[in-house]
Curated annotation (Swiss-Prot):
The keyword Cell membrane does not apply. One of its GO terms (biological process) is translation. Keywords: Ribonucleoprotein, Ribosomal protein. The keyword Transmembrane helix does not apply. It comes from Methanoculleus marisnigri (strain ATCC 35101 / DSM 1498 / JR1). This is Large ribosomal subunit protein eL39. One of its GO terms (cellular component) is ribonucleoprotein complex. SUPFAM superfamilies: Ribosomal protein L39e (SSF48662). GO terms for molecular function: structural constituent of ribosome. It comes from the Archaea. Belongs to the eukaryotic ribosomal protein eL39 family.
Length: 50
C-alpha cells in the first residue's frame, strides 16, 4: 500500500467512526435534549473531501 493510499484509508476510517449515532446513554442523561448530531453524513447524499 502506498503512502498516499494509506493516508486516504486512515481518513476514510476516521469519517466512518465519526458517522455514528448519539449513544443511548447520552440521550437518557440529557433527557433527549441531545437526540441527534448535525454532522451525521449519508453516503449517498453527501460526498467526502478525502
Amino acid at each position: 500500500m502506498s503512502k498516499l493510499m494509506k493516508g486516504r484509508k486512515i481518513r476514510l476510517a476516521k469519517a466512518c467512526e465519526q458517522n455514528r449515532r448519539v449513544p443511548a446513554w447520552v440521550m437518557i442523561k440529557t433527557n433527549r435534549a441531545v437526540a441527534s448530531h448535525p454532522k451525521r453524513r449519508n453516503w449517498r447524499r453527501s460526498s467526502l473531501k478525502v
